[in-house]
């Protein structure tokens, strides 16, 4: 219960509430209940436990935590340190999955592209060198700032099929306020590089947030028009306030949330409707418009094949 520890303590009736990642610190829990662990053996990769069979896809996590501290993100609260696995270990994991029949891989890192020359590029070069005919997907938002021609070439050669870039907003002031990890210029450059290397609209998606503190729908509409001009898929994402983040502090100061707030009310599916001051009909219209735009090329291709 790392994010909602107090709420869990007051409402769960649990004997013990643990906060933080379940690593070596887990020994403390056993000690609390009178158990003494003499030794903790090294962890065995789950793929070697005999439980992962006949799956066509596999998740990949090459590191935990994030070197950035965005105002809306809880990554630094969940993982206080940014740590990465050895690239050789990651490549070995991919090869073992591949040998077992897996062809689709999904990266779930919060900062997969950070320091690319020392991490993701060596991984992709090894994949290309091994001749693996695999497909890679990145559902988490990638940092557009790190996408250069060399990286885009490696992503194309290694089989990337799903690319998601994080923009969140086109408002320059809010970009700086929320962490400064990316600018609209960074994103535009990344998209141009990716397209130059052969990636199509349906392979490049960009996350655009709505419901941020103080954000009007006009700003969201401006972001939609910007992304349409770049010819990428648009993924509207609802803001959800998370305890421990900068935006949570802002909302507490403004009296919108507090210690007594029910976690269900902060869910992204309802928060923007309840607390952002938006017209629900206008939000729905935006979503419909984005959906139509996203599938324009699909309908055109389908019409051409008839």
Give residue ranges: language-model regions.
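Catalytic cores of alpha/beta
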Residues: 5-12, 150-151, 213-228
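Glycine-rich beta-alpha loop elements in corrinoid/cobalamin-binding modules
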Residues: 1-42, 238, 244
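Radical SAM [4Fe-4S] cluster-binding motif and immediate context
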Residues: 45-201, 210
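Short catalytic/ligand-binding loop motif for oxyanion handling, primarily in non-cytosolic enzymes
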Residues: 3-9, 25-28, 69, 114-116, ...
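Short, hinge-like loop/turn segments at secondary-structure boundaries
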Residues: 12-15, 34-36, 124, 154-155, ...
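Conserved beta-strand positions in the central sheet of alpha/beta enzyme cores
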Residues: 18, 106, 164, 235-236
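C-terminal accessory regions of radical SAM enzymes
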Residues: 203, 218-306
């Amino acid at each position: 219960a790392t994010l909602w520890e107090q709420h869990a303590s007051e409402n769960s009736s649990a004997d013990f509430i643990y906060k933080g990642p379940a690593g070596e610190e887990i020994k403390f829990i056993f000690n609390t209940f009178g158990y003494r662990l003499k030794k903790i053996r090294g962890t065995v990769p789950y793929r070697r436990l005999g439980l992962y069979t006949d799956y066509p896809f596999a998740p990949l996590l090459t590191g935990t935590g994030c070197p950035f501290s965005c105002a809306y993100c809880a990554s630094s609260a969940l993982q206080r340190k940014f740590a990465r696995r050895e690239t050789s270990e990651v490549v070995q994991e991919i090869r073992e999955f591949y040998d077992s029949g897996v062809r689709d891989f999904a990266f779930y890192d919060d900062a997969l592209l950070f320091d690319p020359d020392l991490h993701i590029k060596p991984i992709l070069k090894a994949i290309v060198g091994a001749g693996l005919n695999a497909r890679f997907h990145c559902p988490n938002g990638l940092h557009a700032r790190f996408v250069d021609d060399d990286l885009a070439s490696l992503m194309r050669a290694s089989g990337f099929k799903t690319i998601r870039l994080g923009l969140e907003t086109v408002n320059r002031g809010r970009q700086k306020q929320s962490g400064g990890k990316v600018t609209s210029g960074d994103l535009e450059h990344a998209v141009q590089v990716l397209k130059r290397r052969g990636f199509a609209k349906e392979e490049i998606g960009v996350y655009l947030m709505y419901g941020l503190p103080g954000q009007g729908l006009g700003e969201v509409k401006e972001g939609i028009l910007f992304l349409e001009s770049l010819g990428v898929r648009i993924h509207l994402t609802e803001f959800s306030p998370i305890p421990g983040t900068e935006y949570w502090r802002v909302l507490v100061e403004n009296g919108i949330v507090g210690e007594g707030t029910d976690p269900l009310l902060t869910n992204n599916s309802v928060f923007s409707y309840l607390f952002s001051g938006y017209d629900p009909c206008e939000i729905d219209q935006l979503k419909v418009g984005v959906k139509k735009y996203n599938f324009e090329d699909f309908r055109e291709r389908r019409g051409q094949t008839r």
